[in-house]
């Protein structure tokens, strides 16, 4: 981040809840923002994260959750994909270093497209992976001027009930997108075995079966495609 200090503002937060609230505030103000935390940190940040799913965003908002299957350096092995389901969040799951870069760009675009936060779900082996990554040209995101929208961002019951209905409409649109998006596609090889994968499980399956199986590789795993 120090390489881009003239263009990108970053800070440490006292805890994950504060980090999420700061990122949400930046999004409301009209800029793209993200906060990153390990899996147990999302427990701390759950309060604002559940609510921003209702309110939506202005600038793109991405919440990175790093899970730790196998408990290599964590106090539990919780699966934060369940948070995405409970909070009704759009979720992306990259399987490689290249996809981490590509999906992050997509996450901001989808956040703004659907007026919704995106949970960017990674795991230990993805976070510790190394690989050659093609970066491409830097693209500056447009600043969206702040507008005072009480009915959108003040989640008092009178507003929140309407937000809840609106959220279901957005989720239906996300599901339709998931059915055809380029990161949810079959990979055909031998058709005797089929494996449905997401995240690092795609790499494990390919290492085990190679071309002796076909794969349905899901990069956008929630809302679930029908």
Question: Residue ranges of each PLM-predicted region?
Answer:
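Thiamine diphosphate
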Residues: 1-97, 125, 182, 188-192, ...
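Flexible, low-complexity linker and terminal segments
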Residues: 94-226
């Amino acid at each position: 981040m120090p390489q881009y200090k003239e263009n990108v503002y970053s800070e440490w937060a006292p805890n994950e809840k504060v980090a999420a609230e700061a990122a949400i505030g930046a999004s409301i103000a009209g800029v793209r923002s993200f906060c990153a935390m390990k899996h147990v940190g999302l427990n701390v940040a759950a309060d604002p994260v559940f609510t921003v799913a209702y309110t939506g965003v202005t600038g793109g908002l991405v919440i990175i959750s790093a899970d730790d299957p196998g408990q290599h350096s964590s106090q539990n092995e919780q699966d934060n994909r369940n948070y995405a389901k409970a909070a009704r969040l759009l979720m992306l799951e990259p399987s490689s270093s290249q996809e981490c870069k590509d999906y992050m760009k997509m996450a901001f675009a989808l956040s703004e497209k659907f007026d919704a936060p995106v949970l960017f779900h990674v795991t230990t082996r993805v976070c510790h992976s190394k690989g050659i990554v093609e970066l491409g040209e830097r693209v500056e995101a447009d600043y969206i001027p702040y507008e005072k929208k009480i009915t959108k961002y003040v989640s008092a019951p009178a507003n929140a009930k309407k937000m809840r209905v609106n959220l279901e409409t957005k989720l239906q649109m996300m599901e339709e997108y998931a059915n055809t998006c380029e990161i949810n596609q079959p990979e055909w090889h031998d058709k005797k075995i089929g494996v449905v994968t997401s995240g690092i499980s795609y790499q494990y399956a390919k290492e085990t079966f190679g071309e002796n199986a076909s794969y349905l590789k899901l990069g956008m795993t929630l809302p679930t495609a029908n």
